Amino acid sequence: MKFTTVFFDIDYCLLDTPTSERRIIKELYAQQGQIVDDAVGDQYRQINKELWVYLDRGEITREQLYVMRFTRLFAIHPFFKPAEEVAPWFLDQLARAHDAQAGAEHLLQRLRGSGVRIFTASNGVGSVMNGRVEMAGLSKYLTECFAADEIGAMKPSHQYFDYIFKHSGETDLSKTLMVGDNPVTDVNGAVDYGMVGALFGARWQEPSKATFVAKTMKELENILFGKE
C-alpha cells in the first residue's frame, strides 16, 4: 500500500447517493398521490448533474441550483407545489439520507488497519455531509472531514486542495490519493495540485487525469491492495 493519506468525496463515492435520491423523489410524488418509478429519479439526477457543471464553473449559485433542478424536473413531471417550496424540503430529506456505498465500510476499515489516514473532501455543506457520513456508520474510520463551506473554496481550485493537504498533516503528495466521482473537480483538481487521482463510479464519461479508475469499492480495493 503506497498511500499514507486518502481523501474521499462523499456523494456518489462513499455514499450511494442515487439510491437515496430515487427514494426521496418517490416520496415527493407520493405527496400528490402519484406513484413514480426509478426513471423519474434518474431524470432528476441527470438534471442535477448538468446543473452542477454550471455551479462548478461559477455560472450559477448553489441556491439557484437547488431550485432550478426542480423547476426543470416539474416541467417534465408536474408537481402541485412550486420548486421554491420543494427545494428546502428535499435538502432536509437528503440531509437524513445515509445509504453507504456497497463495500465502502470494508475498504475504510482495511485502509485504517493499514495505518492510512482517511479524510473526506466534499463540495457540500460540512454539517450536512458529516452528519450523513456519521449516520452511515463511516465516521469512525475518518481522521477529519473537509467541506467547501468551511474552507471557503470549492474543488477543483488550488486553494481547496492546498487547504486539505496542509491540514491533513501529510508532507508527500506522491503518497496522497484523492478518490472521487467527478473527473474535473475531484480528479483533475487533485492531480493538478500534485496528488494522485482515482476516478470512482461511472457517472461521468468525460476524460480525466486519473491514475486509477474503479466502478466499485471492490475494484478500488483490488487496485490499492492487489487482488487476493
Annotated model-derived regions:
Residues 2-102:
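N-terminal helical cap/lid subdomain that shapes the substrate entry/recognition surface
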Residues 18-22, 101, 105, 130-132, ...:
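Conserved strand-to-helix beginnings and helix N-cap segments that scaffold or border functional pockets
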Residues 58, 95-96, 117-118, 174-175:
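A generic structural signal for short
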Residues 1-6, 109-112, 119, 124-228:
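Asp-based, Mg2+/Mn2+-dependent phosphohydrolase catalytic module
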